[in-house]
Design a protein with these regions (language model features):
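Short, basic-rich loop-to-helix N-cap that marks the start of a DNA-contacting helix
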Residues: 43-60
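A short, Lys/Arg-rich alpha-helix, primarily the initiator
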Residues: 1-27
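Short, charged recognition helix plus adjacent turn
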Residues: 32, 37, 60, 67-82
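Recognition helix of helix-turn-helix/homeodomain-like DNA-binding domains
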Residues: 29-48
Length: 82
């Protein structure tokens, strides 16, 4: 599992809930910019990973289980869930 895999899963999960990443963050009680693409890498080029707390909050706010999220990590075609 890579940095990109986790961020792609968040993007796909948000889409599956008919939300933008910003909308998903806001719905979850997070800052709306939490999942912005600009925050996925530091200014020094180091990857920033989403926190387990953030993932926990998006699951709780949507009533999803961890399996509902992790299925998007290895999914080759997100279009089937749009």
């Amino acid at each position: 599992m890579t940095h990109n895999d986790v961020w792609t899963a968040i993007d796909r999960f948000a889409t599956s809930k008919k939300m933008s990443c910003s909308g998903l963050a806001k719905c979850s009680g997070l800052d709306p910019t939490t999942f912005n693409r600009s925050k996925r890498w530091s200014k020094e080029g180091q990857p920033r990973w989403p926190s387990t707390n953030s993932i926990s909050k998006i699951l709780a706010s949507t009533g999803a289980k961890i399996q509902d999220f992790t299925k998007y990590i290895d999914e080759p075609d997100a279009a089937s869930h749009v």
